[in-house]
Curated annotation (Swiss-Prot):
Species: Enterococcus faecalis (strain ATCC 700802 / V583)
Gene Ontology terms describing biological process: one-carbon metabolic process; S-adenosylmethionine biosynthetic process
GO MF terms, alphabetically ordered: ATP binding; magnesium ion binding; methionine adenosyltransferase activity
Protein name per the record: S-adenosylmethionine synthase
Swiss-Prot/TrEMBL catalytic activity: L-methionine + ATP + H2O = S-adenosyl-L-methionine + phosphate + diphosphate
Length: 394
């Protein structure tokens, strides 16, 4: 039993500078995978006033027009006017791309285990590292409630902006939600909501506060979670006209907690965007979420965290760890046994299991990689439920 407590998570909109960088990196990755599914991509992006810098290591047979992809991505986000200090037409795009290091490539091309002649041992992990996956029964999508609500708020802001319902909104925005949990660890109410949204110069704070409460908060936060004690901070600085890459420089991979579980679960430190699936930072994090979600969906635990760890150039994970936080009747060793039996966690196994050589990544680069109900992502499927139950019944 725990004490009543508060927990807070945040999200950012697609127009946040770090998210602009993530989307550019993943748009380039998708364009390359469309033509060359076997490409090795590690694409980083930095954005600032009037400038996008694309750099990293890419080995591919494909040609893609990086300038064109960058400009279109920036425009799609909503940076279409020079007065924003950053727009798709006039922004300078610098490209500095190298090939993947041959020292890394040799470990990925032929894993340590390849001598055993199993073709799934052909691909070694692209780096060492540890990755976490998590699921909890607080929401239908099996995500922690604070991050789920935070994502809903900024997605709603983008929707109202793009549909011109609130035409004064600009692309950059952030949200933060504090949830109160009872002594059983169950969410009871929303304690605090913070929303900061970029806006046109002429719009008053009073207008913004009214619109955000009526058309954003009341539309996406369940009414039973709000009460007279809920606190609201809407544009608490009073003004947010200068924003996006003009207000702050942005960089790929700087919003890894927004991308995952909002701090509710641990994180191994590796970012996702701009990386192809031989990079276990990305693919093994997706696999760990897939495992965790299926365990909770099967009713085997109410809350579970899965850790995977890899060595560079080695196909098999060096460790698998599962923590059910006392919410399962099963020993964690039994769950690990069932996971090993039903999930191939070698990089090639994950790539095949989740079909990760497809251009599916740009859509994940804003509003979270997990718990998405608006798009169809393979690691969000619960198609291993029966197999897990069957393994544990043996």
């Amino acid at each position: 039993m725990t004490e009543r407590h508060l927990f807070t998570s945040e999200s950012v909109s697609e127009g946040h500078p770090d998210k602009v960088a993530d989307q550019v990196s993943d748009a380039i990755l998708d364009a390359i995978l469309e033509k060359d599914p076997m490409a090795r991509v590690a694409c980083e992006t930095s954005v600032t006033t009037g400038l996008v810098l694309v750099f990293g290591e890419i080995s591919t047979t494909a040609y893609v027009d990086i300038q064109k992809i960058v400009r279109q991505t920036v425009k799609d986000i909503g940076y279409t006017r020079a007065k924003y200090g950053f727009d798709g037409e006039t922004v300078a795009v610098l490209v500095a791309i190298d090939e993947q290091s041959p020292d890394i490539a040799q470990g990925v091309d032929a894993a340590l285990e390849v001598r055993d002649q199993d073709e799934k041992d052909d691909i070694g992990a692209g780096d060492q590292g540890l990755m976490f996956g998590f699921a909890v029964d607080e929401t239908p999508e099996l995500m922690p409630l604070p991050i789920a609500l935070s994502h809903r708020l900024v997605r709603r802001l983008a929707e109202l902006r793009k549909e011109k319902v609130l035409p004064y909104l600009r692309p950059d925005a952030k949200s933060q939600v504090t949830v109160e949990y009872d002594d059983q660890g169950q969410p009871q109410r929303v304690d605090t909501i913070v929303i900061s949204t970029q806006h046109d110069d002429e719009t008053t704070l009073e207008q913004i506060e009214k619109d955000i409460k009526e058309q954003v908060i009341n539309e996406v936060i369940p009414h039973e979670l709000l009460d007279d004690e809920t606190k609201y901070f809407i544009n608490p600085t009073g003004r947010f006209v200068i924003g996006g890459p003009q207000g702050d420089a942005g960089l790929t991979g700087r919003k890894i907690i927004v991308d995952t579980y909002g701090g509710y679960a641990r994180h191994g430190g590796g970012a996702f965007s701009g990386k192809d699936a031989t990079k276990v930072d990305r693919s093994a994090s997706y696999a760990a979420r897939y495992i965790a979600k299926n365990i909770v969906a099967a009713g085997l635990a109410k809350k579970v965290e899965v850790q995977l760890a890899y060595a560079i150039g080695v196909a098999q994970p060096v460790s698998i760890s599962i923590n059910t936080f006392g919410t399962s009747d099963l020993p964690e060793s039994k769950l690990i046994e069932a996971v090993r039996k039903n999930f191939d966690l070698r990089p090639a196994g994950i790539i095949e299991m989740l079909d990760l050589r497809r251009p599916i990544y740009k859509q994940t680069a804003a509003y979270g990689h997990f718990g998405r109900t608006d798009i169809d992502l393979p690691w969000e499927q619960t198609d291993k439920v029966e197999a897990l139950k069957a393994s544990l019944a043996e």
